[in-house]
């Protein structure tokens, strides 16, 4: 089980990413396609944005336990929680494989 502070940190990062997404995208577009002087200025502004507003810094975590590894994107939980919930029949449409 992850510490509550780690879960809170990820939530805080997600909020920052959402808040600065449009501004970051606009600046990156200028850096890619603008004139060199404008591109340099946009790059400087991009560096002034908060470090945690970069989506690369976000990490997928299990919604139930906060576990960072073994994350299954389709369900948003870790492999351990997935197995436990599937065994108990808590995930609709999931059953053990047999062939």
From Swiss-Prot:
Q: Provide an example Pfam family for this protein.
A: Ribosomal_S14
A GO molecular-function annotation: rRNA binding
What are its GO cellular component terms? cytoplasm; small ribosomal subunit
Q: Which InterPro entries match?
A: Ribosomal_uS14, Ribosomal_uS14_bac/plastid, Ribosomal_uS14_CS
Q: Which PROSITE patterns match?
A: RIBOSOMAL_S14 (PS00527)
Concerning SUPFAM superfamilies, the annotation shows:
Glucocorticoid receptor-like (DNA-binding domain)
- State the UniProt keywords alphabetically: Ribonucleoprotein, Ribosomal protein, RNA-binding, rRNA-binding
GO term, biological process aspect, one: translation
Name the HAMAP family for this protein.
Answer: Ribosomal_uS14_1 (MF_00537)
Q: How does it assemble?
A: Part of the 30S ribosomal subunit. Contacts proteins S3 and S10.
Q: Which family does it belong to?
A: Belongs to the universal ribosomal protein uS14 family.
Function, as annotated, reads: Binds 16S rRNA, required for the assembly of 30S particles and may also be responsible for determining the conformation of the 16S rRNA at the A site.
Q: What is this protein called?
A: Small ribosomal subunit protein uS14
């Amino acid at each position: 089980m992850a510490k509550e502070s780690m879960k809170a940190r990820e939530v805080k990062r997600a909020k920052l990413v959402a808040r600065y997404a449009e501004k970051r995208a606009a600046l990156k577009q200028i850096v890619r396609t603008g004139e060199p002087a404008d591109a340099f200025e946009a790059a400087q502004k991009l560096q002034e944005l908060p470090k945690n507003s970069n989506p690369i810094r976000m990490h997928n975590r299990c919604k139930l336990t906060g576990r960072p590894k073994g994350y299954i994107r389709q369900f948003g939980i870790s492999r351990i929680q997935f197995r436990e919930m599937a065994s108990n029949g808590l995930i609709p449409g999931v059953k053990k494989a047999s062939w």
